[in-house]
Amino acid sequence: MKFRVDDEVIVIAGADKGHRGKILKVDRDKDKVVVEGAARVWKHVRQSQKNPQGGRLNKEMPMSASNVMLVDPSTGKPTRIGVRYLEDGSKERFAKASGESLGQIAPAKASKAAS
């Protein structure tokens, strides 16, 4: 999965279609993301020492990563994410629509010839 925490995304499917928000959490094992303000549900909480009031909590639930698209920082429109290698051998994410860099993923690997 190419999403990272704090990426701005737009929901493209489901009840919250069209909602924009930042990614709060990424679960790579289940291929799910938690988007700020989207997929909100009421969670009923029993009284306990940790939560003496009890009651209902409104919280964001995870949604499938296939239901969101990254918002291109330069155009503000949804775009796919690509990965490319730079000249120094490091990997970076980029917006496929505009080609703008979204940040480095991995540093350059040390060559085996140097050792």
From Swiss-Prot:
Residues annotated as transmembrane: none
Keyword field: Ribonucleoprotein, Ribosomal protein, RNA-binding, rRNA-binding
Record GO biological process: translation
Matches recorded under SMART domains: KOW (SM00739)
GO cellular component term of the entry, any: cytosolic large ribosomal subunit
GO MF terms held by the record: rRNA binding; structural constituent of ribosome
Region (Disordered): 45-77, 96-115
PANTHER family: MITOCHONDRIAL RIBOSOMAL PROTEIN L24 (PTHR12903)
HAMAP family xrefs: Ribosomal_uL24_B
Subunit structure, interactors included: Part of the 50S ribosomal subunit.
Function comment: One of two assembly initiator proteins, it binds directly to the 5'-end of the 23S rRNA, where it nucleates assembly of the 50S subunit.
Listed name of the protein: Large ribosomal subunit protein uL24
Organism: Rhodopirellula baltica (strain DSM 10527 / NCIMB 13988 / SH1)
